[in-house]
């Protein structure tokens, strides 16, 4: 009877963690390449969302904005209330500019530093859709757009192959299901999600990954102890 109670309690704890605290995430596709790759397994936390929205640079899990059964994984680029512009040039490099207030000819905003975007892909980034414009929800490329309150502008790191706010529009805060903080598969890439900062999310992820790291060390010691001594 005691074993049954323990099993039920453990199952209830796991359910509560998945429902309100953390969730596993399977990366499908290459829209977040090179930082995240196809079939990577991640841990996303939900706790920080109860105390406010995500921060710029966070990798978020969002509800599919189109007919799809799978969640989307994107990076937060623009925050609620900000002005954003993706500036094309002769090389089609989509530099992103952000401003807290309505930009003028004298205040052109600040260009974002995006180290998570691969230099190889950055040289080929299209500013918008194939037709040279944003979706009907947003004006043409190179124009400033105002992000409504409680909405976010999200994009994939692999800008050439990502369906994101450039095509489906702003992402409401209510559609954000979690913040990806750590990768636990493959094991040789175990660690924090690229671009993540030391925040509450990282502390939570570190605590989650600690048993896995200990298991890897223990297995390494076990394998080394099985080796035969070198001949003298």
Placement of each model-derived feature along the sequence:
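Soluble "head" domains of membrane/secretory-pathway proteins
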Residues: 3-6, 11, 17-26, 32-232
């Amino acid at each position: 009877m005691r074993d049954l109670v323990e099993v039920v309690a453990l199952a209830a704890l796991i359910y509560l963690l998945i429902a309100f605290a953390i969730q596993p995430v399977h990366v499908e596709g290459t829209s977040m390449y090179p930082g995240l790759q196809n079939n990577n397994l991640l841990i996303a936390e939900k706790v920080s969302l109860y105390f406010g929205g995500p921060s710029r640079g966070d990798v978020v899990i969002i509800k599919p904005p189109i007919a799809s059964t799978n969640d989307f994984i994107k990076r937060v680029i623009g925050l609620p209330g900000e002005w954003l512009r993706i500036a094309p040039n002769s090389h089609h490099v989509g530099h992103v500019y952000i401003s807290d207030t309505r930009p003028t000819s004298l205040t052109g905003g600040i260009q974002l530093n995006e180290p998570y975007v691969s230099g190889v892909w950055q040289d080929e980034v299209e500013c918008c859709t194939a037709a040279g414009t944003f979706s009907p929800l947003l004006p043409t490329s190179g124009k400033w757009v105002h992000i409504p309150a409680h909405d976010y502008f999200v994009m994939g790191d692999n800008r050439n192959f990502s369906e994101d706010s450039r095509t489906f529009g702003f992402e409401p805060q209510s559609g954000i299901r979690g913040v990806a903080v750590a990768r636990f598969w493959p094991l040789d890439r175990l660690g924090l999600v690229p671009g993540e900062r030391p925040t509450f999310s990282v502390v939570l992820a570190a605590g989650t990954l600690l048993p896995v790291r200990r298991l890897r060390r223990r297995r390494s010691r076990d394998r080394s102890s099985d080796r035969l001594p070198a001949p003298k």
